[in-house]
Amino acid sequence: METTTIHVMRHGEVDNPDGILYGRLPGFGLTDLGHAMAQRAADHLVSSQADIARVVASPLKRARQTAAPTARAYGLDVECDPRLIEAGNVFEGQPVNSDRSLLLKPSVWKYYIDPVKPSWGEPYVDIASRMRAAVSGVLRQVRGREALVVSHQNPITTLTRFARRQGLAHAPWSRHCSLGSITSFTFTGNTLVEITYEEPAADLVAQAADMTPGDSQAALKR
């Protein structure tokens, strides 16, 4: 039975001078360091002789830019799938790291009622469902080969927790999904047999700033 690997990559460092929670807002492309992270991933896939047959990205600019070097390396187009988009969040557009008082206003207390769902944004179950559907679609189309899928930290973390049969609710600071990281899902037929995690740009992450660094070496973007 054929073996298929779907490499799910988080985008590189984002150009966000005002330190806002950019979420699904338009714009917000990569910094020079972010572009270097994207190139590092492409070089890593080529050097490891990954048999990339498709490159699919979230429609957000930072994800498309991250996917571009790999697409060029393999002579492919970057396809977009809205199911790979960042998670919705009621605090989108606000400088939540530099002004923590925004999170303490009585008007937002209602968003903390259910952290398991979570009540401040898109439900984890919905994120897991759309990410699973997106990856399953790519799996069907690249049987016996490999693909690169570029998404965002929360969706990738939620998908990984779902695949490992862990609870979907989690603390953002615990996420093991650094900028430019690749979480690879390997299937035999339709059966998931292995999940691996790599950081081709680990040295660059240590120089980066991230709105949600998780457990990475990136600095907290303020």
State the predicted function of each range.
Residues 4, 9-79:
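Active-site-proximal alpha-helix that buttresses catalytic centers in soluble enzyme cores
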Residues 105-126:
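Short glycine/proline- and acidic residue-enriched helix-loop micro-motifs
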Residues 69, 158-162:
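Active-site signature of alpha/beta-hydrolase-fold catalytic machinery across serine-
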Residues 6, 145-153:
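Generic beta-sheet signal
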